[in-house]
């Protein structure tokens, strides 16, 4: 009996010693020996248990008074029984026992649960392992058909690590750094237990220990690895391995010690500096970020519980899943809905519009936390999630703030927001492109005049700096265009101070003024009729020299030289004479002293009464009317409103002149913008060709660098590579500016092709005065009101207030732009 007790104690001590060795860093030979001892100990323990059960079921009672003992009275652990003489205290039979069958290699399992009647297929849903991460509901479509023949039912009673069995091929473990049976996550969210071996720099995964060809063979050189820990019943530790040129690999481990051991081995193989085993620490080279960008895009805005631990270093507590969901068979309706939703979001265009919100890591109380950041109205808002249901912290005002990159080895794409030298927030992006995008957004909202190229980037890689600067400039320019895009209803309105510059670059058409012959003029209007004279519109084309008459003396000095004839180019309203009817207007020449005295009186009386912009317009037009034309000009004649004859011919001729003027202006603008567009397109093609050539030279230079061994030549090649990188950045910047210029020229070309009237704005004719005179009582004041001054019809149309305008399709375009702005915000 002492021998059996010593043997039992030896087995216990050996088991404890093997557990201690699990926490040590052993060589490959020691690992193999330890795994062999663990397997032998497990086999001996199982075989002794099976022998005990067999003997217990077949034992006989020596005394008739003794009955079979119940199972509860028999101790669970007994030493192996040997044949001997029967005694009163021995329950073994007298004769030798038959040869026992070899114990089966079946690991212990708990009592199987009886499947429910309503879900006969629940057995497949309960296959080990069942749990999934929170965001994997829509991915569990298959039922793991290929893993039915695997050992998936082993529980925690066995050894902490399941090592390869003795019948496994020794070649699988030869020269292996580490090997064990681990869970490997497949592409549909399934988990399969496979034999994972790290040999040299490669990770090999076998379906079973008897296979000779691996299911997965990946080179771990240059790969990154992240350790994640979750408080769940199974697979509480995961390793996410991101190789250089392969898909992401997720391994499930049973304990933290095993996870740390595998993490240390993988980091040694990958050649990356050790980051420790703490959760959330990871080191991802920039080249790997560029190569493995595609598989990570779909996970960009998913929960961090899928493949990574929380940013603040605390393990996440998964949501409690419904028990009914585990027992039911097949794919749930919620899974189908989630699956469709994920597919629809992945098919959306990545750059639907200028994105002003995304997930960023925010430093809060010395801990990094993931927050949904949103920029609006020069404020940076922080939310717990993208639904904006809960505010994480108070909004941050960006006005007057500075944005500075602040990279570190652990956080490559972090940047700070400062106000008067005081740090307000520290943020971190997920990639160089996203960092540049947010730098441009924040610089635009803060009102800073700093160019993204002027910021200090502490990066060695020139491509990374170029990517950040390019993304920052793009988002900065897009923000400027978004909030300063042209408004066709307020942009380009003529200034009141420079009315003369509107048509300076357009060929002046012939001046047409139609007037009735002098002999057909009616007598003067009756002075007692009391009718107020109507406003008279002279269809004169404005010329630059007309409006640049600086003084009234110069304008009046030219009046005596004008002969008293009917072919003068000015028509004024005159006080009606007695004895005439209101329907008979009278035309006086500008040579009459009454007319010459009345014009200064109108100007002098109008200026102190209404010092408004309208007076300036009337004065300017009054100066414009004092223009003399030579008597031998056949096309220049004085015009007066005639009620007796229809003015159809006059209107047609005036309209044709104005249309000709607008047509000439439109053709000139269309031609100019078309030439500008063609020139920019040619420059764009040249820049593209130059960029392609530079990139080709850069690629060839990199290949030469890889093959070169001479240090002197290597330094020269690196210097040349830096110059080519700088040229690429400059050409890319020129290309971006050129693209924006082309877009602006195209918009101007469309406006020019639409015609002289901006965006279909029409003039309401009901607000315009009729050309025919109407009988009205004469004003009591001797001086006529300022409105009686003759004005130019073209100038009046241009200076008419916006309230007179009737917007047709322009209203539709304006509303469409407002809706677009609302949708973008």
UniProtKB/Swiss-Prot annotation:
Keyword Repeat annotated: yes
GO terms, molecular function: protein tyrosine kinase activator activity; SH2 domain binding; SH3 domain binding
Domain PH, chain residue ranges per copy: 175-271, 353-447
Region Disordered, annotated ranges: 62-163, 571-614, 757-801
UniProt GO BP: inflammatory response; positive regulation of DNA-templated transcription; positive regulation of epidermal growth factor receptor signaling pathway; positive regulation of interleukin-8 production; regulation of interleukin-6 production; regulation of mitotic cell cycle
Subcellular location: Cytoplasm
Modification after translation, per record: Tyrosine phosphorylated (by SRC).
Top-level taxon of the source organism: Eukaryota
Compositional bias ranges of the Low complexity kind: 593-608
InterPro entries in UniProt: AFAP, PH-like_dom_sf, PH_domain
Coiled-coil regions listed in the entry: 657-754
Bias (Polar residues) ranges: 80-94, 759-769
In-chain residues carrying the UniProt-annotated modification Phosphothreonine: 113
Modified residues (Phosphotyrosine): 56, 413
Residue positions where Phosphoserine is found in the record: 408, 484
Function of the protein: May play a role in a signaling cascade by enhancing the kinase activity of SRC. Contributes to SRC-regulated transcription activation.
PANTHER family membership: ACTIN FILAMENT-ASSOCIATED PROTEIN 1 FAMILY MEMBER (PTHR14338), ACTIN FILAMENT-ASSOCIATED PROTEIN 1-LIKE 2 (PTHR14338:SF4)
Quaternary data: Interacts with SRC. Interacts with LCK when tyrosine phosphorylated.
Protein's name in the database: Actin filament-associated protein 1-like 2
Organism: Mus musculus (Mouse)
Taxon lineage: Eukaryota, Metazoa, Chordata, Craniata, Vertebrata
Gene: Afap1l2
């Amino acid at each position: 009996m002492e021998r059996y007790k010593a043997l039992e104690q030896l087995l216990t001590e050996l088991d404890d010693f093997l557990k201690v060795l699990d926490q040590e860093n052993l060589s490959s030979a020691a690992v193999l020996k330890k795994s062999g001892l663990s397997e032998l100990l497990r086999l001996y323990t199982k075989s002794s248990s099976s022998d005990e059960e067999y003997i217990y079921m077949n034992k006989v009672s020596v005394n008739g008074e003794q009955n079979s003992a119940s199972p509860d009275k028999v101790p669970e652990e007994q030493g192996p029984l040997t044949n001997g003489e029967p005694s009163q205290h021995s329950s073994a039979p007298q004769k030798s026992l038959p040869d026992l069958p070899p114990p089966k290699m079946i690991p212990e399992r708990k009592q199987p649960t009886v499947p429910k009647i309503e879900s006969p297929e629940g057995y497949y849903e309960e296959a080990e392992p069942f749990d999934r991460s929170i965001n994997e509901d829509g991915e569990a479509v298959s039922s793991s058909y290929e893993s039915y023949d695997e050992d998936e039912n082993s529980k925690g009673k066995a050894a902490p690590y399941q090592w390869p069995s003795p019948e496994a091929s020794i070649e699988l473990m030869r020269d292996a750094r580490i090997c064990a049976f681990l869970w490997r996550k497949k592409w549909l969210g399934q988990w399969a237990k496979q034999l994972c071996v790290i040999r040299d720099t490669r990770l090999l995964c076998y379906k079973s220990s008897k296979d000779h060809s691996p299911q997965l063979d990946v080179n771990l050189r240059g790969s990154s690895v992240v350790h994640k820990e979750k408080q769940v019943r199974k697979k509480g530790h995961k390793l996410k391995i991101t190789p250089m040129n392969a898909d992401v690999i997720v391994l499930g481990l049973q304990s933290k010690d095993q996870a740390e051991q595998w993490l240390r081995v993988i980091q040694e193989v990958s050649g990356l500096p050790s980051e420790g085993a703490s959760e959330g620490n990871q080191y991802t080279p920039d080249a790997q970020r560029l190569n493995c960008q595609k598989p990570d895009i779909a996970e960009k805005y998913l929960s961090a519980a899928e493949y990574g631990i929380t940013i603040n270093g605390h393990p996440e507590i998964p949501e409690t899943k419904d028990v009914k969901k585990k027992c039911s068979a097949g794919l749930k309706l919620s899974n189908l809905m989630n699956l469709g939703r994920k597919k629809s979001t992945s098919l959306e265009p990545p750059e639907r519009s200028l994105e002003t919100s995304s997930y960023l890591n925010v430093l809060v109380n010395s801990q990094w936390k993931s927050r949904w950041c949103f920029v609006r109205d020069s404020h940076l808002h922080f939310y717990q999630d993208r639904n904006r249901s809960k505010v994480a912290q108070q909004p941050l005002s960006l006005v007057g703030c500075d944005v500075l990159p602040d990279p570190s080895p652990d956080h490559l794409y972090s940047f700070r927001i400062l106000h008067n030298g005081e740090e307000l927030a520290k943020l971190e992006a997920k990639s160089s492109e996203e960092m540049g995008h947010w730098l441009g957004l924040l610089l635009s909202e803060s009102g800073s005049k700093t160019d993204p190229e002027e910021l200090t980037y502490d990066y060695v890689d020139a491509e990374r700096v170029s990517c950040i600067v390019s993304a920052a400039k793009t988002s900065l320019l897009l923000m400027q265009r978004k909030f300063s895009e042209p408004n066709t209803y307020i942009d380009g309105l003529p200034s009141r101070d420079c009315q003369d510059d509107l048509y300076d670059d357009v060929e002046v058409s012939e001046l047409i003024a139609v007037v009735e012959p002098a002999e057909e003029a009616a007598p003067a209007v009756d002075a007692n009729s009391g009718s107020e004279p109507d406003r008279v519109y002279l269809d004169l084309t404005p010329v630059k020299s007309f409006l640049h008459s600086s003084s009234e003396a110069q304008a009046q000095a030219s009046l005596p030289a004008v002969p008293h004839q009917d072919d003068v180019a000015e028509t004024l309203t005159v006080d009606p004479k007695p004895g005439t009817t209101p329907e008979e207007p009278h035309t006086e020449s500008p040579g009459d002293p009454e007319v010459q005295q009345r014009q200064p009186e109108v100007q002098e009386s109008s200026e102190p009464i209404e010092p408004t912009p309208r007076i300036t317009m009337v004065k300017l037009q009054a100066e414009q009317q004092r223009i003399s034309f030579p008597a031998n000009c056949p096309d220049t004649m004085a015009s007066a409103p005639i009620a007796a004859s229809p003015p159809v011919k006059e209107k047609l001729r005036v309209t044709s002149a104005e249309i000709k003027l607008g047509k000439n202006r439109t053709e000139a603008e269309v031609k100019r913008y078309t030439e500008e567009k063609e020139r920019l397109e040619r420059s764009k093609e040249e820049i593209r060709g130059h960029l392609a050539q530079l990139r080709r030279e850069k690629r060839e230079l990199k290949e030469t660098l890889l093959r070169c061994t001479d240090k002197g030549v290597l330094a020269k090649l690196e210097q040349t590579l830096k110059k080519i990188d700088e040229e690429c950045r400059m050409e890319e910047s020129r290309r971006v500016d050129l693209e924006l210029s082309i877009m602006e020229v195209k918009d101007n070309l469309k406006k020019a092709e639409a015609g002289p009237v901006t965006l279909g704005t029409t003039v309401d004719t009901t607000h315009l005065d009729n050309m025919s005179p109407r009988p009205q009582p004469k004003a009591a004041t001797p001086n006529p009101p300022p409105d009686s001054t003759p004005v130019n019809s073209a100038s009046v149309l241009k200076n008419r207030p916006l309230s007179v305008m009737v917007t047709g399709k322009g209203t539709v375009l304006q509303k469409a732009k407002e809706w677009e702005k609302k949708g973008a915000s």
